[in-house]
């Protein structure tokens, strides 16, 4: 990473969705929030922050809810982890869109949004640079095809959910119907803050179901294709696979 790009990234913001209930990981998550589950000796969220700081991203906003006080107590202001951390607490579960809307006042003009259970070791600096150069509203990380799916679960149970054209425009997003789709949402997307104007305040809503269809219809959602496997630690199988990778 050259010095100019590194300076740009030092002011970039990562937003991590860390408020989920972690129902697939019970009984572990009955007493600790899912992002605090240990992976190879460190809380998973710490692993995510290490990926981001390694790419020069040193500002993080954590969207927390369930047992969020434990997350704040552990990470504090982020200083001892090499970054600056702030928090947005959801009064009740608001979904991906609602959590962002709740944190609107704390968001920069654009930011990289990361699922709180996704481990994806990509070059986040390059992702952000490509977003700036593309001048698009949203740039979603799209992974391979179902036969080369995440190493954390068998390909047979991880269907494609994105349609991507040859010129990198997302043409479809379906969570339940993979027919004709050729890529997988890897759990990372760069967004312009301006999209939040499309969301209602104080209501539960989903980016995937309410915002992505609008962006796709207007040709505003582009894909950043990667061959780097991603890991979903939100299930016992995924957690075990990631633990083996990082051991």
Question: Where is each model-derived feature located?
Answer:
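Conserved N-terminal catalytic core of the sugar/cofactor nucleotidyltransferase
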Residues: 2-16, 38, 42-119, 124-126
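A short, conserved acidic/glycine-rich loop-to-beta-strand motif
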Residues: 134-144
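Conserved adenylation A10 loop of the ANL superfamily
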Residues: 18-25
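Hydrophobic packing residues within well-ordered alpha-helices of enzyme cores
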Residues: 25, 71-75, 242
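Conserved beta-strand termini and adjacent loop/short-helix elements that scaffold enzyme active sites
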Residues: 65, 88-90, 141, 173, ...
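Short acidic-glycine loop/turn motifs at beta-strand connectors
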Residues: 163-168
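Conserved catalytic-core motifs of eukaryotic protein kinase domains, centered on the activation segment
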Residues: 27-30
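Catalytic-core segments of class I nucleotidyltransferases/pyrophosphorylases
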Residues: 57, 111-112, 119, 125-132, ...
């Amino acid at each position: 990473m050259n010095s100019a790009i590194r300076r740009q990234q030092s002011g970039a913001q990562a937003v991590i969705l860390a408020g989920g209930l972690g129902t697939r990981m019970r009984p572990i998550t009955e007493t600790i929030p899912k992002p605090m589950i240990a992976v190879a000796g460190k809380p998973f969220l710490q692993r995510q922050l290490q990926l981001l700081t390694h790419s020069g991203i040193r500002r993080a906003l954590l969207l927390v809810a369930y047992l969020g006080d434990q997350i704040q107590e552990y990470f504090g202001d982020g200083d001892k982890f090499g970054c600056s951390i702030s928090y947005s607490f959801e009064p009740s579960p608001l979904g991906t869109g609602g959590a962002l809307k709740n944190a609107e006042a704390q968001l920069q003009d654009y930011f990289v949004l990361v699922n709180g259970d996704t481990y994806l070791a990509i070059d986040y600096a390059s992702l952000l640079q490509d977003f700036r150069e593309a001048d698009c509203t949203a740039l979603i990380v799209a992974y391979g095809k179902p036969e080369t799916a995440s190493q954390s679960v068998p390909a047979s149970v991880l269907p494609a959910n994105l349609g991507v054209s040859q010129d990198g425009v997302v043409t479809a997003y379906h969570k339940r119907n993979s027919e004709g789709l050729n890529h997988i949402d890897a759990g990372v997307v760069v967004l312009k803050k301006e999209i939040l104007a499309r969301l209602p305040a104080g209501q539960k809503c989903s980016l995937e179901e309410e915002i992505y269809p609008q962006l796709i219809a207007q040709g505003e959602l582009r894909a950043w294709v990667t061959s780097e496997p991603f890991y979903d630690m939100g299930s016992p199988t995924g957690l075990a696979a990631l633990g083996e990778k990082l051991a």
